[in-house]
Curated annotation (Swiss-Prot):
Protein name per its UniProtKB record: UDP-N-acetylmuramate--L-alanine ligase
Localization: Cytoplasm
EC number(s) given by UniProt: 6.3.2.8
Any one of the GO BP annotations: peptidoglycan biosynthetic process
Amino acid sequence: MIRRLQDNGDLIRAFPRVHFVGIGGAGMTGIAEVMLTLGYEVSGSDNADNAATRRLATLGARVMRGHSAANVLGTDCVVVSSAIREDNPELMEARSQRIPIMPRAAMLAELMRFRHGIAVAGTHGKTTTTSLIAAVLSEGGLDPTFVIGGQLLAAGANAKLGAGQWLVVEADESDGSFLRLNPLVAVVTNIDADHLENYGNDFSRIKDAFTEFLQRLPFYGLALLCLDDPEVAELAGKARRHVMTYGIDAAADVRAEDVVQDGARMCFTLCLPEGKVIPVTLALPGRHNVLNALAASAVGWQLGVPPEVIGRALKSFVGIGRRFNDLGDVAIGNGACVRLIDDYGHHPRELEAVFAAVRGGWPDKRLVVAFQPHRYSRTRDQFDAFAAVLSSVDALVLSEVYPAGEVPIPGADAKALARAIRARGRSEPVVVGQVASLIEVLPDVLQEGDLLLMMGAGDIGSIAQRIAHDGFVFGEV
């Protein structure tokens, strides 16, 4: 019998059980939490536990360790992460049982059907920008739903079901899945050469995908574009939709003037349309974060959030997990301490932006970087850029590449990168095989008063947390 489904409540009653394959992924946990809050029965599987899966379990999700065909029995729909292989036993069982299978981005698009979507795309800055937009709209009383790729520290989660009509999400360009979304507002922060393997190693195809992303807006939709990024600026003439620009560039519709860094804060004048001007203190360091804040300000202004409320939201924003997280002072022995910062940056342009933020806020400190490269393909494709930016720091420790499912590529490992950096004559990198070895190696590199920046998108963040909590290990691990 075919049922007539009138609203989302009918959908939940008809198809209540949703299973997530790879539920621990950054893009999956937020969708799972929103669906739990909507009333779905959520289950999921992953090969490893993390804080997000443990949170889902406390909220009522059934989370299984490892993948098994039995995990999908009785499920009405299977949501799959892009990291899951086609021969996964749960996917194979779902196909044999004719259970609907939804890619992660397709399920995100389904959630967007019931709300006005704001999708944030761009090679860098998506998570911070999405979080800032959610903070501005929340401060403005719009109570948005949001799904973010990192933990919004103020909420203690990377997702929340709000009572308002707006849904704020990250739009992932890495595999082209952002083209499944149909937002009302599209933000593009920047466009860079990353994930080229998914675009035939052709940068022009990435740019074409962003153009198509904007063309998916309805005729009454809005494209918010960063004028400071030359690739994004080119989109303004191709969008064929309503466009608003933002940036530090003097021609931007929403812009920042008189930008000054004060330690971990940025101070600037926010210039909005119609002559609205307010002083802003942003509780995040770096010029790149000013641009992220301008995107959020533009969205807030478009949706009627008063300028003073926008300023208040930016000032009170406490950040996102693993985005320039100040973990405090850590002892290195003999009464000496260093300042520890943890950051997710894993692309040369991201490293450059974070290094600039450190030097702008703490110009007198020696910058020591512990970096875990992420993916052999990215290390190969950005090899010279990595060597250039990493050779600029005062001291460097490299761990082996975090593979993220890739097989090693000759000449794209940590030792090869160290040789290229050494050849530039500025620094002598230290290479460790396992990222956990940083705990015992770093004390020999560090000096009193250093700023230690631990960066990478792999598991180096867990090592930073261990150091912050337990300190360094002197002697044997």
